[in-house]
Amino acid sequence: MALSSALDSLWHQLDQLLSLINRNIITGIIVLPVLYVLLKVIYNLYLSPLAGYPGPKLWAVSRLPWNRANMKGRISWKIRELHDKYGPVVRIAPDELSYTTSGAWKKIYGQRNPEFVKALDGRGIAPASIGGQRSLMTEHQDKHLRLRRAIDPAFSQRALREQESYFQDHSDNLVQKLKQRCKDGPLDMTTWYNLVAFDIVSDLAFGEPSGCVNNPDQPWIQAILARAKAIVWFQLAVQYGFMGLLNWMTPKYVTESRKKHIAMTEAKLKARVEAKNPGKDFMSYILENDEKLNHLELVMLSSNFIVAGSGTSAGGMSGLTYLLLRNPDKLEKLKQEIRGLFKSRADMTLQAVTSCKYLRACLNEGMRLYPPTPGSLPRFVPGKGEMIEGKWVPGGYAVGVNQLAAGHSERNFKKAREFHPERWLDEPDSEFKDDDRSAVQPFSYGQRGCIGRSMAYAEMSLTMAKLVWYFDWELDEPDNDWWNQQGTYLVWEKLPLQVKLTPVSDVVE
């Protein structure tokens, strides 16, 4: 009896002990994460090396506000708003600073040794590699320099002169198609600019046009455009470590579009390499270069040419078209330059159109207000840290210049939200003489800046000159705020831009 009573007492005590342990475990499960978050918040707000930088408190303690704005396609607009409120440097995440100054461009993107390496943890281009292969835009410094040496001859001024026929033929074809189609009503110029840009870069890359202007439903361009908005999901997955899950959950049309793009790139590349009498396209310079590339490197480079080469110029022309139509006095001034300078279509050479001062000013002003990449491509501060704009930033933190905010900043430009090409003309006593034009770098800056800058200017100059020469323009929906309602997904959303085109009757072919 005594033994039984003792055992009951022991079991009762054990039961109480287990209950106490369980309660403590449950309490710990609840309390410890809360305590961790609380300590993290306190650290980010008051103890972090970035604690002294201005910015919204919620963005300083968590990456989630950045993610939310990014997923909604409003990240560039939101960061512009933050710079308007807080100044030229803003803390936009617990471990990231955003800048809008020319000095930040020079330091972050221009410094070579040590280099500020690209942040490929989901803040910018994502994913960094596909199938283990990096692209020109995400490659490590030594490999990137090797690839640049291999392709530099293809983007030289000599190459550009030898490739003029590609630009002339495709811009002429665009004009003819627009003449045929404009009789039926307004045309979506966003689409047409993408089509002609794709034809030009495809012909330059492979010596064979893709036929997009002649066949607007061409599957290749549809495959690329289908991927544009998907990048925010890849950024989120890379940041929070669920790329495997995302790949499993990704809709079939997205994965198929990616596979289709690579397959078509490989097929075009194979045909070009095996061609008997190719013209002077990109590949002719690359294959003749002493810096030899393997097949996979050629495929990835070709993919970069197609995606980046077409998107930059098409976006630049779309933005400029809208801004000119919103500012008819500037459009009229451009008409006077183009129609006064050129007496016939034959006069419109690359050299001639790229020498048009007001046209060039319009292109620069268009890309200031509507930059091809409106956000930021952040870099990591190297080593133990660097001085940026007079303040020490420790190593390992992310920093970058936001293109949209920099171009729209009243600290950099007078009448910053207005379209004034005159600010780029270097006129004496100009009201814009104090503008910090170096704060705008639409093709990025430094050794990783866009290698196709001259090509893009040539393409945009020739195409826009011909459209101004051949047509009068009018917005179909003048009240439609096409620009401000566009989302940004690393690049612009590319909403339709409906324009009424009227052929000019007295042009000389």
Curated annotation (Swiss-Prot):
Q: What is its EC number?
A: 1.-.-.-
User: Keywords, A to Z?
Assistant: Heme, Iron, Membrane, Metal-binding, Monooxygenase, Oxidoreductase, Transmembrane, Transmembrane helix
Per its record, what are the GO molecular function terms?
A: heme binding; iron ion binding; monooxygenase activity; oxidoreductase activity, acting on paired donors, with incorporation or reduction of molecular oxygen
What InterPro entries does the database record attribute to this sequence?
Cyt_P450, Cyt_P450_CS, Cyt_P450_E_grp-I, Cyt_P450_sf, Cytochrome_P450_monoxygenase
Where heme binds, per the record, is at C450
Q: Name one GO cellular component term.
A: membrane
**Class of this enzyme:** oxidoreductase
Compartment(s) of residence: Membrane
Q: Where are the transmembrane segments?
A: 25-45
The cofactors it requires, by name, are:
heme
Q: What is its main location?
A: membrane
Topological type in the membrane: Single-pass membrane protein
Which pathway does the UniProt entry assign to this protein? Secondary metabolite biosynthesis
Give the family per the record.
Belongs to the cytochrome P450 family.
This chain's function reads: Cytochrome P450 monooxygenase; part of the gene cluster that mediates the biosynthesis of alternapyrone derivatives. Alternapyrone is a decaketide with octa-methylation from methionine on every C2 unit except the third unit. All the domains in the polyketide synthase alt5 are apparently involved in alternapyrone synthesis, that is, the 8 CMeT, 7 KR, 7 DH, and 4 ER reactions in the 9 KS-mediated condensation steps required for alternapyrone synthesis.
Its recorded name reads: Cytochrome P450 monooxygenase alt3
Query: What organism is recorded for this protein?
Result: Alternaria solani
- Provide the gene name from the record: alt3
